[in-house]
Regions:
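Accessory beta-strand-rich segments of carbohydrate-active enzymes
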Residues: 23-33, 47-53, 57, 83, ...
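Surface beta-strand/loop "capping" patches
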Residues: 251-285, 380-385
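Internal, hydrophobic beta-strand segments that form the core of beta-sheet-rich folds
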Residues: 185, 340-355
């Protein structure tokens, strides 16, 4: 085999290993994902209207039969401004000087007030027959900034903060097999702040974050402008349902936040001690204490652990499995995770189920890698050196800044991280003035051999 053939074989092998990781592991098929058909090719039609232009009550807006024929099509996940531009109410902000505040082409919230960008978002959905007799949950993963969540004429939750996800039990408020209505009233940030003129010069001379008042909110600080955004920030401060909303069902108990902590034995790095944790939720189903069993399985490794528990009405309980209690959680000669160009990105899968009286109530899964990361300054100039699984690694890092108007998708995220990997980058700093990224984003890190620093 000549050198060219060997090179092509290696290139295709690497390309295939990266390509094979582009499926969103977090998007389980047992959920209903309420993404819009506009821009996201989802299955749901969303409409939006400025709250001040709606005369009907919230109960009417969120009930079947309400007429939205004069409402605008909405992009969900997305923002108010994304949808307004999509409906050609305002010009494309990224084109020419359209977004310059002096142009007055797109109203800035600091001049027109919060009410101008306060909107209703509305859609209709069906609950499948398979959800009958179960607890039914509505999960908004991110709304900026405050929101009222209405289902079939009932206010079921209020959300405060851009990076808050919510778990809303809608069991008693939806009809299985029939149409239901979800209406979300979305409010902008409490303190929008104002943009400030940017003088040309060194980075330190720019007015990052406008007048600084945007920092009074827990939100995307760069939405008001930063030293890399010449065009004066985002006019609506990215108000909207910016992450997906999903619907799913569980039994009388629910599971959340499965996590695996790995500890490698040194100096051989040939023994791994795994600690598993998960949260159990009792959504006020019973007045009595419920007893059950939590089962954890590291798939394909013949490692299974079980633990009985009792939980009170409305309680959230954390259950932990340690290698001291369960010797099978000590793995000998584990397949280690390595960063790009240092070895394979081996990943394990954990599946956790919770059962009551032998019936499975809920199951969750997550993927994890086994690795050890350390650093020291034992160098002549006291510079920091990093080690992975005891091997010295040279850090090639970069900064990660989100798309300004939050126009993103799984396909775009995958492409951008793939390009980053192909550039030889092995560490990304998630800049604090941006967002809390999507689950899919972090999934790709593990599969591509890239670290992240927050």
């Amino acid at each position: 085999m000549n050198k060219l053939s060997i090179f092509l074989l290696l290139f295709l092998s690497v390309a295939y290993s990266v390509q094979s990781s582009n499926t969103n592991y977090a998007r389980t098929t047992d959920r209903i994902w309420l993404d819009s058909n506009e821009m996201h090719q989802g299955e749901y039609s969303w409409k939006m209207m400025k709250v001040s232009d709606v005369k009907a009550s919230a109960e009417e807006v969120s009930s079947l039969g309400y007429n939205t024929s004069d409402w605008l099509s909405a992009i969900v996940p997305g923002t108010v401004l994304n949808s307004l531009v999509y409906n050609k109410k305002y010009p494309e902000p990224y084109y020419g000087l359209n977004n310059k505040i002096e142009s007055n082409k797109i109203p800035d919230i600091s001049k027109v007030g919060r009410e101008f960008y306060t909107y209703w978002f509305r859609t209709e959905f069906e609950v499948p027959a398979s959800f009958s007799g179960k607890n039914i949950w509505l999960q908004p993963d991110g709304i900026n900034y405050r929101a009222e969540v209405w289902v079939n004429g009932n206010l079921l939750s209020t959300i405060n903060g851009m990076f808050v996800n919510d778990y809303i039990n809608i069991t008693d408020f939806v009809k299985v097999g029939n149409k239901n209505v979800l209406a979300v009233k979305v409010y902008p940030v409490d303190v929008p702040g104002t943009t400030m003129p940017k003088s040309w010069g060194a980075v330190g001379e720019y007015h990052n974050g406008g007048n600084g008042n945007i920092g009074l909110n827990t939100t995307m600080l760069m939405s008001i402008g930063w030293d890399f955004t010449f065009m004066d920030g985002i006019r609506d401060r990215n108000t909207g349902i910016w992450k997906s909303i999903s619907i799913y069902s569980t039994g009388i108990l629910a599971l959340r936040h499965p996590f695996v902590k790995s500890e490698l034995q040194k100096p051989g790095y040939d023994v791994a001690r795994e600690t598993i944790s998960v949260e159990i939720i009792d959504p006020f189903h019973s007045m009595d204490t419920i007893s059950g069993v939590v089962r954890g399985e590291i798939v394909g490794e013949n490692i299974v652990v079980e633990k009985p528990f009792s939980i009170l009405r409305g309680e959230e309980k954390n259950v932990t499995f340690t290698p001291e209690e369960f010797p099978q959680l000590t793995i000998r000669n584990p397949r280690l995770w390595w960063p790009i160009n240092k070895g394979p990105q081996n990943l394990y899968e954990l599946k956790v189920t919770v059962s009551v009286k032998g019936a499975v109530c809920d199951s969750v899964k997550t993927r994890f890698g086994i690795r050890d990361i350390t650093s020291d300054t034992n160098t002549p100039d006291k510079s920091r050196v990093f080690y992975v699984n005891g091997k010295r690694i040279f850090i090639r890092g970069t900064n990660w800044i989100p798309e300004g108007m939050l126009r993103t998708s799984d396909e775009r995220t995958y492409a951008e991280l793939r390009y980053t990997r192909q550039a030889g980058i092995n560490l990304i700093r998630l800049w604090g003035g941006g967002i809390a990224e999507f689950d899919f984003f972090f999934q790709l890190f593990g599969g591509m051999g890239v670290f992240f620093l927050k």
